[in-house]
Amino acid sequence: MTAIAHDAFIYGYPTVDLYSILYKYAVDASSREYKAPLNTIYNTRRVATPEDRAIVAPNCDTPYSYAWLDLRAEPLVLSLPPFEPNRYVSLMLVDLYTYIVGYVTPRTNGNVGGDFLIVGPGWQVNTFPGIKRILQAPTQFVLALYRTQLFGTGDTAAV
């Protein structure tokens, strides 16, 4: 029985841990880690410091924007502006199993930006008018992490 308990812990821990982050970031407004409600983008205007502990080892030269997406009722559209050709930007989507289920970057889409439909489990949509790409997650909650390269402290207003 000990081996089964150990295996269950190893299997389930990432999901429980990520849900804990979801709760601190988007549900419990009294948490010191609280960012914004579900389906709302929170933008940081600074790079990560050692005090930022909810997510392990974020980049120290890319301010982050966060959004916990709740796909239980319906899909969501994330709109991204055109990307500057010389600046690293990315949108990474992470499901509750901690798998990356989608990436939007200049390498995957070019620098033009666009509207991206994020759908949860069970949605059977292949195309949608005005949507550049459809990204499907196997879980009903998805973490959207936006990264924008910072070219030094004087560049903060640009990101």
Q: Positions of the model-derived regions?
A:
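A compositional/structural signature for long, glycine/proline-rich flexible linkers
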Residues: M1-V159
